[in-house]
Structure formats: structure tokens, C-alpha cells
């Protein structure tokens, strides 16, 4: 009898070790998915201006093409969400695999000497990659809701770390070896993305159909979730703010007396500072209400843009880039968790897809207008407009939070 407690204790210890191993394995695999997702942004979208400029595009032309890509991405995200909601055999996992394969094909085709083919494939890549965050977030949130021990905030932090590394490396390689390096790095990122999806397959299959039936039948989604709709409007304005800087960072850096290498370093700094806040998010969310974190992060979008406006050197831009720890770094993780609580559990796929669609909508508006603003008014006007959009976005998010949570806070998934 004396040995029984010891046996039970050992069994519990072994189970605890197994749970930890599963958590590490699941988080590592999902981290590869997030790294692939955000590394695409660092390699292809961040250097789209460089690539298109080399092919004879003006700032307005770059803005129009990237704006069109964002519009296509918005349509793709809504299409993917509706198809997954209605077709039981189609999952976001399948969509993710297919998307990574298409991205690999487009990355290879960008090397073509046929300008029309190369530009066309670059356009497809820019469109599809903007749908990847929604796909990845839906995969992760479904798996977590179905019982997966995946640490989302850690994986998302690894995604930012991957963005930082690839942005810095891409900047160096483009400056020294030419814009064609974007294609080779795109193939590397595709391999990472596919590896992550295959390794994570055992976690996501359990939750892939969790929210299909209810979502397919529900009508008037926005009418039933008014606070979410207001939040989504705010998210669009924040994405306009964010994209006006990231998508035209090359022109901004040139105005601040910098180079393509400085552009890559600034982008890398913006991403690397996100990592600590994402890793620490589970602990922060236990002490600070999630709604407060979302509102706080919204204000910092405007603060960062204003700092970019004030500084006049590459060094100043590096300092301004570091402020992303409190803007996009905190927002991107807090918003995903907050939205999961704004809507019923059965509508997670649709809500996450709409949240992710805020990025291409904001991208479409910012890229459509950004090029014309640069050509007609200049860099400083672009940064001022970005600041105003940040303030408007923060205001909408505050209204959404007040409307939804009057006296009751929404708990964050990653605080559990």
C-alpha cells in the first residue's frame, strides 16, 4: 500500500512530461507555420516596391498594383472562409497546403525573363500571402479550441522573429546581389511553411470541422455581432496606418537619407521587438484585461507614425521602428484572442477570417492612395495621414470594447 502513492505520483509525472512534450512539439510545428507566413511578408511584400521599381513602375504604379493585390486578397479570404464553412471536406489546413504550393510556384516564376509572367506571378504572390495570416490564425485557434496545447503567443512571436531575420537578410542580399534574391528566398520560405503544416497536421485535424455547421447556417453575422463589426472598422484603420509605413518603407527610408540595407534593418527591428511582448503575453494577459491591451496597442500605431514623421535620419527610423513592440507587436496577438471572445465559439472561423481581411482592406486603401500621396504631397504628408488613421482606428476599437464589455472583461485564450 505504501508503494501506491509513489506509483500514482510517477504516473502523474510521466503524464505531465508527455503533455509538456506534446506542447513543445505542437508549438514548434505551429511556429514554423507562423514563420513561413510572416517571412513571406518580409521577403516578397516588403520588397515589392524595390522589385517593381526595377521593372519600371512609378510610385503610383506600385501603389495601384499592390492595392489591387490587397483587394484580391480580401476576396480570397472571404471566399476561403465561406467555402470551409459550407464544404465539410474542405479545411483551412488544405487551403494552407495549397497556398504554400502556389507561393512556391510563383516565387520560382518571378525569375522568368518574360516580364509579363514575372510581374503576374509577383502579383499573385502578393495577393495570396496577405490571406495567409487568416489561414494560419484559423488553423491555430481551431486546434486550441479543440484541445491542442499549442502556445499561440509563442508561435506568433517566432513568426515575428522569422520576419526580422528574413527582412534583414533580404535587405543585405538585395543590396549586394540584386532583386532576384527575392525569388530564391521565397522558395526557402515556402519549404518552411509546408514543413510546418505537415508537422502540425496531427493537431489541426481534430478541430478542422468544429465550427462548420453553425457558421454555414447563421445569417446576419455583422448584425448579430455589432461590437465585432465596430472593432473590424478600427482594425482596418490601424492596418491603413501600418501599411502606409511598411509598404512604402523604401521611399520613406530614402527620404530619411537611408538605403535598401537600412530598409531591411528597420523592418528587422520592427519585427524583432515584437518577440518579447508575444512571448510574455500569457503572463501579461493574466494581470491586465485583454480589452485594455487591445486599446493600448491601438494608440501606439499613431505614436509610431508620429515618431517616423519627426525623425530625419536612418538612426531615428530605427528608434521609431522599435516602437512596434507596443503597436503591431501587442495588437496582433491581443486582437486574435479578443476576437475569439467577441463572437460565439461556433463562428470563430468566420470572425478570424474577417479580422485577417482587415489587413488587405487596409492594404488596398493605403497602397491605392499611398503612391499618389507620395507623388503629389511627399513622404511627410504620408506619415501625417498615417498618424491620423492610427488615431481613428484606436477610437473605433475603444468604442467596440465599451459596447461589448460594460462591466465584464473578455479573458484572453493565452492567459489560461
Describe each region flagged by the PLM.
Residues 14-24, 200-233:
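Juxtamembrane intracellular "pre-TM" segments in multi-pass secondary transporters
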Residues 20-70, 227-235, 239-266:
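Helix-loop boundary and gating motifs at the non-cytosolic
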Residues 35, 115-133, 236, 316-330:
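Hydrophobic core of transmembrane alpha-helices in multi-pass small-molecule transporters
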Residues 59-60, 146-158, 260-261, 343-355:
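Loop-to-transmembrane helix entry/capping segments in MFS-fold secondary transporters
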Residues 76-89, 174, 277-289, 374-375:
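Helix-to-loop junctions at the C-terminal end of transmembrane segments
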Residues 92-106, 292-307, 387:
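Structural signature of the two symmetry-related core transmembrane helices
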Residues 123-158:
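Cytoplasmic helix-loop-helix junction between adjacent transmembrane helices
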Residues 349-376:
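A late C-terminal transmembrane helix in Major Facilitator Superfamily
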